[in-house]
Amino acid sequence: MRCLAARVNYKTLIIICALFTLVTVLLWNKCSSDKAIQFPRRSSSGFRVDGFEKRAAASESNNYMNHVAKQQSEEAFPQEQQKAPPVVGGFNSNVGSKVLGLKYEEIDCLINDEHTIKGRREGNEVFLPFTWVEKYFDVYGKVVQYDGYDRFEFSHSYSKVYAQRAPYHPDGVFMSFEGYNVEVRDRVKCISGVEGVPLSTQWGPQGYFYPIQIAQYGLSHYSKNLTEKPPHIEVYETAEDRDKNKPNDWTVPKGCFMANVADKSRFTNVKQFIAPETSEGVSLQLGNTKDFIISFDLKFLTNGSVSVVLETTEKNQLFTIHYVSNAQLIAFKERDIYYGIGPRTSWSTVTRDLVTDLRKGVGLSNTKAVKPTKIMPKKVVRLIAKGKGFLDNITISTTAHMAAFFAASDWLVRNQDEKGGWPIMVTRKLGEGFKSLEPGWYSAMAQGQAISTLVRAYLLTKDHIFLNSALRATAPYKFLSEQHGVKAVFMNKHDWYEEYPTTPSSFVLNGFMYSLIGLYDLKETAGEKLGKEARSLYERGMESLKAMLPLYDTGSGTIYDLRHFMLGIAPNLARWDYHTTHINQLQLLSTIDESPVFKEFVKRWKSYLKGSRAKHN
């Protein structure tokens, strides 16, 4: 190079170097363009989603979520699913594979000699679109993002088995009911202002009181009370002398009256109010932005109302919920929601969940389901009272689980008929081949869950009105379905307690096990003498369950009932949420009965959730 530099002018040398660099760059670019662009391949469990599969998975994600949401029922707890984020970056298979150099090609896939779908071939591997796999094999999957990367998650089932915390006791948590939220179900029209319990629209838009739903409402709040921390409670009014140092937040317009007066029946002071219906009413500023369970003691002397003004997430608009002294169920007009709470001419406590009352009012419809709404309260602004009456103990709290539990317990006591049952006043058609159940039928599941509720109320209060009601509830267990009871006999040998006392018998599994749990609660609580009948019914039922469990095992899942045996039709396979309910129930029973059969079935049925199958011949 030094020899060349000595003989060549430096300007010529610069030109030669520049030409050499240009040639090098051109050759480099040409070589790079001839190479295929390779993308790093990420491993995934399950079926790969490439190209059009990704677009299909994204477009089907909403359908997937809607399908899972439909798995709700009064018997099985619906599982919440994480919604997959949308997937971007899909491309045409032919163009995409050429541009990006992917090693797959499109291939026709003939399905069962019936129809053809488009798949992907990569060497000896063939990939089918997951939208087809999902429907064909009844499996589930979604694309999720972790740290900015997409990952496809595949699952054989969508429902979850809850671990049994400890041996079951009649005064403890009821199964996994602390996870139930009965009042938010779209088939709950509202929480009745008069009764304080949910009104169901599951089988009719007119609404009716469904004992199973009411018992579940009580048991869920009882269980939440045991598993959640104590609520925060803000006291706004007690009418006592110690409140004199607090600022007077009551506004009393002209023509209205309010004063502290002594109530001899309560041995305390209360707030007396007089406010004509045509007036603005007397009002108490609240201003709570954290909690939305309001409670107050109330006694009306005339017709009246107590209204709560809410600031909402709906463009900060104000909505008012009116609790009125009439029997109207619920009404909604513009930004006013009305709940009838009855005359209330004697002292009673009104406890309302303002979130539920707001959303049920705004979502009010004439169909079976409440319309979905995103509206939420942001602030409890003030309380307004009209008419003539008395108020006391105005509070706002995080939760009021025991108020809900006792509302359900008291309803069960008040509405039990002379035969010991809770008649269901709506027609129920279980399926083709079964006679319709006309209004007034009993359900063993309702009897069992009601007993479990009443036993807990008795254990808390020692009030025998609850225990006596639970004892009377065993009567329908003793009578056959055609005798207006809930009993069926399988193969003239095994006693069974019917969730739906149909003709012919249906032998629904989960409802039967709930009826047994109720009998167990009662026999353990009532003692040797009073619990004798419950013990006998329980023992006969457990013998039947142990003998008949194999009839509900398909080798890959479970069966909801025995209609295939009774009617000679196709079996009614249990959805995954019912399957996990079966497992949860058996887990509970395995803690109170040492028979190994329950643990064996739990182990096998759990494996079905992961895709295991029984061996073939």
From Swiss-Prot:
GO terms for molecular function: calcium ion binding; heparosan-N-sulfate-glucuronate 5-epimerase activity; protein homodimerization activity; racemase and epimerase activity, acting on carbohydrates and derivatives. It is an enzyme of class 5 (isomerase). Glycans are attached at residues 225, 303, 393. It is a single-pass type II membrane protein. The keyword Isomerase applies. Changing residue 500 to F: Mildly decreased enzyme activity. Residues 29-617 are lumenal. InterPro entries: C5-epim_C, C5-epimerase. Belongs to the D-glucuronyl C5-epimerase family. Converts D-glucuronic acid residues adjacent to N-sulfate sugar residues to L-iduronic acid residues, both in maturing heparan sulfate (HS) and heparin chains. This is important for further modifications that determine the specificity of interactions between these glycosaminoglycans and proteins. This is D-glucuronyl C5-epimerase. The lineage of its organism: Eukaryota, Metazoa, Chordata, Craniata, Vertebrata.
